[in-house]
Amino acid sequence: MCAEEAFAFFADPWNLEAITPPWLRFRILEAPRTLERGSLLDYSLRLFGLPIRWRTEIVEWRPPFEFIDVQLAGPYRRWEHNHRLRSADGGTEIFDHVLYRLPYEPVAALLEPVTVRRWLEAIFDYRAGQIEALLA
């Protein structure tokens, strides 16, 4: 699949439910039909069994190669997620880069390597498998 087609998949915020692990019980509460710069998304999920509401804004939108979302409200002190797509041999490579800070530092920093980091790795591994299956 070319970068344009893959980017179109990400431009539909409702596809997030299909690529998010079921154990998070992710549900979109409010979102536009198509993402663009300035779009707001409200959703709920469960982190470590606790109900969380999260609000995200799309702050950069550069079809078909990049977009960035930031958390406006949610569990992190800071969350910035850069999604990059690059045309590759017969398809598209997708890269995710996340910058985050936890609340309750420095205590949270002690737990981060064994909790949050592993949890995020599991989420992104699941997403990669789902994206590959859905966009094949």
Could you tell me what each predicted segment is?
Residues 1, 118, 126:
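Residue-level signal for short amphipathic helical patches enriched in basic/charged
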Residues 11-12, 132, 136:
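Residues at helix-coil transition
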Residues 1-36:
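Hydrophobic ligand-binding cavity/cleft-lining segments
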